[in-house]
């Protein structure tokens, strides 16, 4: 079982198993097509204290799902190196579909782009990145699965905001609900008040969104006191992004697709390659901050 509450997102547990096969076909020296086929069985475990959005989903769609998923990925890469590129670009488009006949049917699409170019005679490097994502239900499924939502915020996303915390917040009902979304009743037939309402374990945790817009600009420069720059990269950055819902209802920190709700940040970042893997830190200030956004002036990962 996986408990996702530790990732700053709405708390729930799930059991999932499956099997799949992958194919890859080079189209040219720089382009590739991939095809993934996977069968997946997922069980969602909800409780009386689960977020109301999760209870609403399970009331509409159930808690047990079997799906046959197909995913097509196209990529085009002209980067001059895999780590710390200084020129070229990479693009990828991914479309995942749970095929008709599955117990839950949805489509999930993403587009990612990175671009690097030396400027001022190669003394500096311009870096640009962007990502957009869309999640939609189709067929008999009315609500897109919350466990496929997009998340934003963090040192690899929109720096200056805590990881996975941007966008709609998980909310709870004033009264305790069962897995069908119905209020539980006491011995007198009265609805049972939720003692955790207003300060539950889901407070300030994101439920994610069905739309993602994210991007960043990096002005990459060398550190003058380091002779070997191959394992270190520093930059001034500007990031922007957020996740959005289809219908906000009474969700907090929520907006439907609106570029005016993009969050911004700027600052200085540093990444270095160690024997344990890449390490990153950022000093950031934020812009267009919402009242419930969780910010971090210093981040390390």
Residue spans for each PLM region:
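Gram-negative/organellar outer-membrane beta-barrel architecture
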Residues: 1-92, 106, 159-160, 166-171, ...
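Transmembrane beta-barrel strands of outer-membrane/channel proteins
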Residues: 1-4, 19, 35-41, 89-97, ...
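Extracellular/periplasm-exposed beta-strand and loop segments of Gram-negative cell-envelope proteins
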Residues: 10, 48, 59-65, 197-210, ...
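Outer-membrane beta-barrel architecture
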Residues: 18-22, 73-75, 92-94, 112-114, ...
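Residue-level signature of outer-membrane beta-barrel architecture
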Residues: 25, 76-78, 97, 115-117, ...
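Short loop/turn motifs that connect adjacent beta-strands in outer-membrane beta-barrel proteins
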Residues: 28-33, 80-89, 102-105, 118-126, ...
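Extracytoplasmic gating/loop element in the C-terminal half of outer-membrane beta-barrel translocons
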Residues: 122-245
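C-terminal beta-signal and terminal closure region of outer-membrane beta-barrel proteins
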Residues: 152-160, 247-301
């Amino acid at each position: 079982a996986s408990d996702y509450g530790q990732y700053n997102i709405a708390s729930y547990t799930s059991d999932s198993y499956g099997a799949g096969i992958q194919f890859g076909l080079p189209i040219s020296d720089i382009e590739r097509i991939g095809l993934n086929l996977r069968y997946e069985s997922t069980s969602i475990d909800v409780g009386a204290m689960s977020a109301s959005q999760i209870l609403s989903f399970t009331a509409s769609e159930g808690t047990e799902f079997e799906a046959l998923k197909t995913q097509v990925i196209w990529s085009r890469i002209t980067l001059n190196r895999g780590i710390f590129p200084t020129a070229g670009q990479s693009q990828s488009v991914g479309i995942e579909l749970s095929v008709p006949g599955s117990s839950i049917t949805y489509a999930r699409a993403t587009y990612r782009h990175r671009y690097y170019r030396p400027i001022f005679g190669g003394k500096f490097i311009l870096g640009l990145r962007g990502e957009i994502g869309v999640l939609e239900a189709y067929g008999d499924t009315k609500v897109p699965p919350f466990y496929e939502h997009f998340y934003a915020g963090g040192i690899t996303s929109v720096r200056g905001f805590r990881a996975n915390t941007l966008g709609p917040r998980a909310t709870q009902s004033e009264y305790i609900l069962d897995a069908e979304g119905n209020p539980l009743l006491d011995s007198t037939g009265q609805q049972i008040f939720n003692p955790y309402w207003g300060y539950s374990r889901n407070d300030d945790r994101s439920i994610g969104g069905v739309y993602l817009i994210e991007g960043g600009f990096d002005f990459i420069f060398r550190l003058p006191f380091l002779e070997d720059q191959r394992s270190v990269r520093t930059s001034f950055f500007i990031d922007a992004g957020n996740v959005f819902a289809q219908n906000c209802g009474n969700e907090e920190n929520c907006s439907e697709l609106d570029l005016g709700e993009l969050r911004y940040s700027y600052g200085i970042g540093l990444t270095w390659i160690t024997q344990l893997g890449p390490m990153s830190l950022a000093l950031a200030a934020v812009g267009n901050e919402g009242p419930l956004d969780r910010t971090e002036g210093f981040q390390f990962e």
